[in-house]
Amino acid sequence: MNIQRLREARHGYLKMAVAFLPIALLIGCNSAPTGTAPGLAGGQALTPGITNYPMAYVKQPVLTKNTNKKNKAATPDDIDVRDLITSITGSDLYVRNTASAATPEVNVTSSLTNGQGAVRDLDVSPDGTKVIFSLRLPLMENLANDDPKQPNWHIYQYDAASKTVTQLTNDDVTAGHDVGAHFLPDGRIIFASTRQLATQAILIDEGRPQYQAVTTDQQQAIFLLHVMNSDGTGMHQISFNTNHDFAPSILVNGQAVFSRWDTENGGEISLYITNPDGTAEQLYYGANSHATGSNIAGTSNNVIQFLNARQRADGQLLAIARPFLGTQLGGDIVVINAQNFVDIDQPSSPTSTVKGPGQMSATSLGVTTDANLPSPGGRFYSMYPLYDGTNRMLVSWAPCLIQGAGGTTEVCSNSNTTGANVVVAPPQYTVWIYDFDAGTLMPLLSAEQGTEIVEPVILQARKPVPAFIPDSSPSNAAQQTLVNNGVGILNISSVYDFDGVDTAKPDIATQANPGQASFYTRPARFVRIEKAVEIPPKTVRKLDQNDFGPAGMGMREILGYAPVQPDGSVSIQVPAQVPFTIDVLDGNARRITAQHTSWMSLQPGETKSCNGCHTTGNVTDPSHGRNGLTAAVNKGAPTTGSPFPGTYSALFANAGETMAQTLSRISCETGSALANLAEPYTQPCSQILTTDVIYPPVWTNSVTTPQPDASIDLYYGVSVVNGASTEGIPSTPPMIIGNCVPWSAQCRITIHYANPASNPADLFIQNLWTTARGPVVAGVATQTCTNCHNPVSLANQVQVPAGQIDLTSSASTVDPTIVTSYEDVLFQHDELTLNMGVLQDLTVTDPGPPPTQVPVMLAAPMAAGDAAASTAFLRMFDGTFHDPVLDHTGFLTSGELRLISEWLDIGGQYYNDPFVAPVAN
C-alpha cells in the first residue's frame, strides 16, 4: 500500500510552512545549531483562547550518553517503550497560570524531588482543575534504575485552585509501581500498576506465594490496569495479561483505550478498549498495522508501536507511533479512524463504506520512524488535543539535528543526512501548537540549553464530556451465582466460522443434523481452556530457560475441557480475572486449528460472545477480537419451541440459540439433569468444564436417530462409561490444584515432563517411559519403554536405542540440565552407531570443499506446541499404524496418549510450575 499517496490524497498536498523559524529561537542562542527547520510557521500570534488557561508540563534534562559508569542509576540515553520503570532523573512538574511564555513558571514538585526525582504521565481532570501525574523519588546511585529496591513510581495530584500537590498512592502492603493515571468521568482514576492485586490473590488460591509476576521476557513486573477512587482508596485490578497493559485514556463514550503489549501476536503493542470495570475488553486498533511506519527511504514499512492514544473532539484518535527503541523517545503522531477501522486497511464492519486508510500521519512535516537515523520532520514526544473547537493540539516536538564537524550541531538538510557516518544529535523537545486545518507548527515555549519540555497539557474542561459507564452488577440470581463462583461465560457461535466464512463440510447446518453423514465425521469435538502461569521475579525464584521448553509458549496450566456441539458452538464457564486462551481439538484431544495467539479474560459474571475462530494470525490475515468485524455465520435455531433438525426432541430451542446455548439453558438454568439422555452429564450444568475429555451423545438417541452418536471418553484414570471400562493412566493423574471434582474456578491441571522434585508421586511424562506394562508374568507387568529405548540392554550390553530414541532419564550429553529422553523426543539429534562395542555418532562425508565428516541428524519424533504434527509418533499406539519392527499398538493407553497430546499442545515444557522446577544457578 502506498501510504504516501494516501496521505497526499487526504491533505490535498504536503503543506509546508509559510515561513522558516530559526532554530535559535527554539533552544537558546548560546547553543544555536546552524540552519533552519522545515514546516514551521513564524510571525504568528497565538490563537485567542489558549492563554486563558493554566498550563502544566515536565522539564527534564536532554538525554545523552551516560559517561558516569559508577552511577548505576544514571538515566540511559534511550529507553525502550516496554520499559515502564526506568526514569529520567532531574525531571519535574512545572505550572504556568496561563499558557504563555510571558507567564512565570513554577516548579511544583521540587520540594519532593530536590531536582533528583522524576515526573511523567500528565493528565487533566475532566473539569480542567487538576493535573494527575506519576512521580518517583530520587534513586540510590549504587543500584540500577529499575532495581526493585529503588523507590516506586506513585500517583500524585496537583490542584490548580489550592496550588497543592497530594500523593494518592503509596508504599503500603500491596506496593508496586503506579504510572499512567487518567481521570474517569466520575472522578475515579484508572492507571497502570505492578500491584496486580487480583492476580496475587489468585496465586494464594493456587497454593503459591504472592509475588508480582514478570513479563514474558522476565525483565520487569507486569503493569496492568487498576482503578481507584479519587483519594487513592478502593484500588482494584481490571485487566489481565502476560505483558504490560498501560497508558489508558478515556474515549468520549466512556470506555478506556490503552496500549497492550501482546504476548504472542508478534510481541507488538496495539490499542485495546475496556469498560472502566474491566468488562467488554477487546482489540480496538492496530494488530496488523505495525509495519506501516514512514522511513527515510520514502516507503512506509517500518515496524511501529501504538502508544499514548488520546481522542480528539471530532472522535478521531491520536497516538504516538514509534519503534521500541532508537528514536530518541519520540516518533510520529498518527490520526486513527478507529471508529471505522480496526487496521489501516480493514474496516471495523463488513458493511462499512467508509474509505480508508484507517490511519495516517497527523502532520505534513515528514516525520520518519527509522531507528538510529535522522527524521527530516523531527520527532514528537507527546501530543495533547485541545478541546476549544480550534482543531489544534499541543505537542512536544524536536527538530531533526545531527552532529556536525568539530562537535557542532546542525539542522538536518538533504546534504548532511546522507552517508554512512551521520550521527543524530540529542533531541531538544520543546512546546509547540500544531494546527490541523492550517497544517502549521507554531512555537509556544522554549527551553534553556541541556533541558527539554515534554508532555504539555492545558487545564481546560474537556468538551464533549466523556460518558459515564457504571460498573456492572448482577442482574439476576444466575448472574450472581457466576459472580459468587468467580467465573464468567464464554459463548462461541461456531468454531467453523472462520472470519465470517463457513468452513464446515459441507456447511454448519448440514453437519449439525444427525440425519446427515457429515454429522458423524465432524472434526471439532472439544475445546481446551489454558491459563498462563505467572512467572515470579528472579528475586523470588530463579528459573532455567530450559524449564519453558522449545516452543516459546511460557508455562501453562489447563483449566478444563468442554465439548464442541455439532454446530460448532460452545458455551462454557471460565475462571474470571485470569488470562486464558482456547484450543479447538479433535476426538483425540489434539489441536486442529492454529494456536490462538492472544489472551482473553473475563470479569466475574461477565458474558463474552464471539462468532468463531480466525485464520493463522499472519499479518496478511484480517484482525480479530473486535466485536462486529464479521457477521456470524451460525444464525442459530430458526424457530422457538422445536428441536434442531434431526435431534433429540427433548432439547427444544429458542430462536437464535446455538446448540450450546440450548443445552446450557436446559441444564443450567432450568436445573434439568438431562436424565433421559443416553449418557447424562457428570455435572448438572453443561457449561461447567471437566478435567476429563468427555462427549456425551446428547443430540441423538435410538428413538429419533437410527444411528446414535458415539461417545468420547478420555480419562486420566480408569472409569466405567456405558458399562465399558475405559483405559486411563495406570498411575496417579497429573498435578491437580484446587477443586476439580466437582470443577471450580480454582481447578488447574499441571503437566511436567521431568520428575517434580517437590512431589515425586505426581505423574510426569518421563514416568510413562518407565511404567511397567504387559505381558504379565506371575501377575506382574514386565515390559517398559526403557527396556528397548535404552543405550544399555537388559543383558547390560551396549546397544543402539530402539528407533534411535533414548527414553532414559540420564543427563543429556548436549545439555545436562535436561534428561536424555526430553532431548531425543523434542529435538533434532545425532544418529548413533555401534562401533566395536562403543556408541558413536554416525557420520557421512560432506564433499565441501574441503571434505569433512559430519554427523547424521535425525528429526525429532514429537513437535513441542503441536500434537497434530506429532501424529506419526502417536498413531503407533492407537492401532492406526503398525510398526513393522515391533507393533506398539496398545503400549500406551488412550489416557496416556491424551496426556502426551495435551502436553505437546500447551508447549512441551520441561516444567509448568515455577515452584516445582529446581532453582537455577
Predicted feature descriptions by range:
Residues 25-28:
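C-terminal motif of bacterial Sec signal peptides marking the signal peptidase cleavage site
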Residues 51, 89, 118-120, 127, ...:
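Beta-rich catalytic cores
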Residues 58-88, 134-152, 191-220, 258-271, ...:
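Short, conserved, GDST-rich strand-edge loop motifs in beta-rich repeat architectures
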Residues 34-39, 100-117, 159-176, 229-243, ...:
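Multi-bladed beta-propeller domains
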Residues 55, 115-124, 174-188, 242-259, ...:
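Conserved beta-propeller blade repeats
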Residues 37-38, 42-45, 50-52, 88, ...:
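Aromatic- and Gly/Pro-enriched helix-to-coil junctions and flexible linker segments
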Residues 92-94, 154-156, 224-226, 270-272, ...:
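A short loop-to-beta-strand structural motif that recurs across blades of beta-propeller domains
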Residues 307-432:
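Loop/turn-rich, solvent-exposed surfaces of beta-rich toroidal or solenoidal domains
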